[in-house]
Design a protein with these regions (language model features):
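C-terminal beta-rich recognition modules with glycine/proline-rich loops and embedded aromatic residues
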Residues: 208, 259, 320-329, 334-421, ...
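Glycine- and aromatic-rich loop/turn segments at beta-sheet edges
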Residues: 49-68, 106-123, 151, 162-181, ...
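Beta-strand-rich binding/interaction modules
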Residues: 427-447
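Well-ordered alpha-helical segments within folded domains of soluble proteins
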Residues: 69-86, 126-143, 180-197, 231-248, ...
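Extended ligand-binding groove/face enriched in aromatic
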Residues: 63-67, 85-213
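Structural helix-adjacent loops and short alpha-helical linkers that scaffold large soluble proteins
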Residues: 21-30, 85-98, 142-156, 195-209, ...
């Protein structure tokens, strides 16, 4: 047996050949997810997707087609429904998907237009092109996952309409609407590249390369909300993702400038909050402001897609760490614990609000990204397999032509103990690579009870051996509660973390705190010697909380804290505060994801 540590690959532009990704995701049909990630998938299907009023809220506007602009998000809903149907294999989910697609195609006009706008308002009003682009993507996904030729035909017809009418977008559209063109048509380049790849028709790629000049797009990250909202995180990240897709077939180093710039901004320049969220009011910010409109859910979804794309391209465990932090904190905080309601923003200080409806960008992008989570757990890695996310799950696929089953058992993120059972159909040699999170210093790995080896954090740990059915890998990742120093606006305070989880204070547990604002709660002082992880099912079954002794605002001199409180997981919908004072800030550590 050969055991090695894979150091993170250099994240430099032009290092990786465009022809070969380091990692390849599995299909959603090959993975079944349990644990908290699986629970979120299930409640999003059954408590959200399946209880929507799809006829009234989503389909009716496309059948009437009398609007002068606006946005519904039906294409995003179809994208989610297609993946959920493929993943769950539940007849009622597939029936909903079929109904959405069939009814949508029935609204397509002879010239190919598909949307909600009346004649005279098509292509030239917000957000008609944006809506149409995702409708094309949804129809294309129905063809990819279910082989529906009518969906492919409708997708191509709509794409041809868009290309043929592109000149109808006014030259001064950005000035007229206050929204830059690349923001107003968010998602179209990635859709057209996918349509070209699946259909084999080069004209859709040519539209992206020539008409949209994707390779020439080079916009620095803009701080603040300026005319044209050029600093729109979702739009910027979506176009950067399209550049990564173009890079895979046309490896121009400049195509990596924007994607790498996002990572640099998030991890080196103050752009990312401790929860993984970024931006205020949908726009890039770097001051660590945690109130109000932090972390638009669309931006969160596209951060996750960017991390996944870079992880696949380079195989750097760092991107898996970013995925883990963002998913377990900001993403899951954007949904009510029962799954029914979704947030537009997920601040770490002050009250959080749910979006009032089921349509529009954030609710629909939330469903989409949750439907993609099964593809972020396991990857093909050369001749072997890589385990990226830890959650109870099962996967079945071939490795080197040999059928393989993987079963992962763990209570993660409540526990750092993980078992991964490897069962090839017959004895086969291949490498298994395990992502060791940057927070998991002192991780031990063993196979079949043999002496454990220590694995370096922040890297992939490789075990290359002949595997037999039932062979079991055991990981033990230490999960001490740690205090993490705040930055910029949060300087002089610290947040509590354990593993990938960030903790927050819900004041409802203590009457004397009921009317205190989140900012004032942050003036409480934590007793580092009191920190204790305890089970807490208030946010999720088998969840975790941290019992903490705190002193009220002032200059505490007594050894005994004034109160003992429970700090819950960041997904706690009543959480109002995340950063707190310390008597001695030297007990806090730096955030391991910030460089």
């Amino acid at each position: 047996m050969k055991i090695a540590v894979l150091l993170p690959f250099l994240a430099l532009a032009g290092v990786v050949s465009a022809q070969t990704d380091a990692l390849t995701p599995l299909n959603v049909r090959q993975v079944k997810v349990r644990g908290e990630i699986g629970r979120r998938i299930d409640i999003t299907i059954h408590n959200n997707l399946m209880v929507l009023d799809a006829d009234k809220d989503f389909l009716r506007p496309f059948e009437v087609r009398d609007q002068k602009g606006g946005y519904i998000g039906l294409g995003k809903l179809i994208l989610a429904a297609v993946r959920f149907a493929a993943y769950s294999n539940e007849p009622n989910v597939t029936a909903l998907k079929d109904r959405l697609v069939t009814r949508l195609i029935a609204t397509q006009e002879p010239d190919g237009y598909i949307g909600i706008c009346a004649r005279g308002s098509r292509m030239n009003t917000l957000w008609d092109v944006h809506e149409m682009g995702y409708l094309i993507a949804g129809l294309l996904s129905d063809y990819e996952f279910f082989g529906k030729r009518e969906s492919m035909a409708a997708a191509r017809k709509a794409a041809d309409y868009m290309i043929g009418h592109w000149s109808e977008i006014p030259a001064g559209w950005g000035e007229q609407t206050g929204v830059a063109t690349h923001v107003a048509v968010t998602g179209i380049e990635r859709t057209m590249l996918a349509l070209s790849r699946v259909s084999g028709d080069a004209k859709y790629r040519e539209f992206v390369v020539k008409q949209r000049a994707l390779a020439e797009w080079s916009l620095p990250i803009v701080i603040g909300r300026r005319p044209g909202i050029e600093g729109h995180i979702y739009a910027y990240t979506a176009r950067s993702l399209a550049q990564l897709e173009l890079y895979r077939t046309d490896p121009q180093p400049g195509l990596l400038t924007q994607p790498d710039g996002i990572i640099d901004f998030l991890t080196r320049r103050g752009g990312m909050a401790i929860t993984g969220a970024t931006g205020q009011w949908e726009i890039w910010t770097d001051d660590q402001d945690g109130r109000g409109q932090l972390g638009e859910t669309c931006a969160t979804a596209y951060q996750i897609r960017l991390y996944d794309s870079l992880l696949r391209l380079r195989g750097d465990a760092r991107f898996g760490d970013l995925l883990e932090r963002t998913i377990f904190n900001t993403l899951f905080a954007a949904q009510s614990p029962d799954g029914r309601r979704i947030r537009y923003y997920s601040p770490f200080e002050g009250p959080r609000e749910y979006h009032p409806g089921d349509t529009y960008c954030c609710p629909c992008n939330y469903r989409r990204i949750v439907a993609e989570l099964p593809e972020l757990i396991y990857y093909r890695s050369g001749s072997g397999v890589a385990v990226n996310l830890y959650t109870a799950s099962d996967a079945k696929f071939d490795v080197n032509g040999v059928p393989l089953s993987i079963r992962q058992e763990t209570a993660f993120p409540s526990s750092g103990d993980v078992t991964v059972q490897i069962s090839p159909e017959h004895p086969t040699r291949f490498p298994v690579r395990l992502r060791i999170p940057a927070w998991a210093s002192g991780t031990r790995v063993s196979v079949n009870g043999a002496a454990a080896s220590e694995a370096s954090s922040g890297s992939f740990f490789e075990i290359d051996r002949q595997w037999r059915s039932g062979d079991t890998i055991r990981l033990t990742m230490p999960m001490q509660v740690r205090l993490v120093q705040g930055r910029k606006r949060q300087s002089g305070r610290a947040a509590l973390m354990r593993g990938p989880l960030v903790f927050c204070l819900n004041p409802a547990q203590e009457k004397s705190l009921a009317n205190i604002d989140g900012a004032d709660l942050g003036r409480f002082t934590i007793d580092p010697s009191s920190l204790e992880a305890v089970q807490d099912d208030s946010v999720r079954p088998g969840g975790i909380a941290c019992r903490v002794g705190v002193w009220r605002p002032g200059y505490p001199t007594s050894d005994k804290p004034d109160l003992v409180l429970r700090f819950g997981e960041f997904a706690d919908p009543g959480g109002l505060a995340t950063y707190f004072r310390l008597r001695d800030l030297r007990v806090a550590v730096n955030d391991e994801l910030i460089h």
